[in-house]
Amino acid sequence: MTDYIADYRTWLQEEKHASDNTLSSYLRDINQFKTWLLGAGSPDLRRVKKDTINEYMLYLSGAGKSPATITRCTASLKSFYAYMLGRGAVKTNPAKNIAALKVERKCPEILTSKEVELFLEQPKCVDEKGYRDHAMLELLYATGIRVSELIGLDMGDVNLAGGFIRCRSKTRERIIPLYRTAIKALRDYITDIRPRIISGPDEQALFVNMNGGRMSRQGFWKIIKYYQEKAEIDKDITPHTLRHSFAVHLLENGADIRSIQEMLGHADISSTQIYTHVIKKQLKDVYNKAHPRA
């Protein structure tokens, strides 16, 4: 029998140029759906009807999955069956008219400017790890890039003389400026520290672990959690927290939302507009606390 999921993976990679995160999420959703079908006694992906998918959505809801997870799963199935339809493996897309659940967009956790300053002060430039970690955290807050983009940076993506980095994806590229402190932190790391810890002269990764290979997501996550504990900041800090804080602090200081959208790499302005809601909420909180008649 044709392995439709393997073929779909190739299609996502080669035709749709899907990001690694999209690829991982979609394939995980499709494989979980296939497992559920097998348990329901109907393992053939070609014989799925709209009612089958509705039943699966009810199963996910009953299993305690969040609306966001169920909505993403719906999108995964729509994409998979659009591919199947294009191949002639099915006559209709059974997921096409499945309504997505309304997902409440929560305001992201934001650090204050003082909390950011405290957090960035935690790595001490007294050894190789301290210099590297200091450079990573400064760069993350200076640019607002995603953690996947941070660990994916190569040496050729950094222009210290010009004061910017080049952030690439499979379909686009963006240029993001750096402030002076971040430039200095990067220069110190690149000039004095990185040559000592890379695995060999052919290593292209900007940030490497202490074994000399490219930094992993898990490794960077542990670094974030380590410095959160040291800073004693009573907030759940993740790699994305600095990205959110970067956007809100720029807005607070007068940056226009289109420029922030470009720096964050958001395809849709609505993804960036959530940060304006954060600021409005902060203003309302200040008003309610400070106004004598509030």
Q: Each PLM stretch: what is its role?
A:
Residues M1-A294:
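Conserved catalytic core of the tyrosine transesterase superfamily
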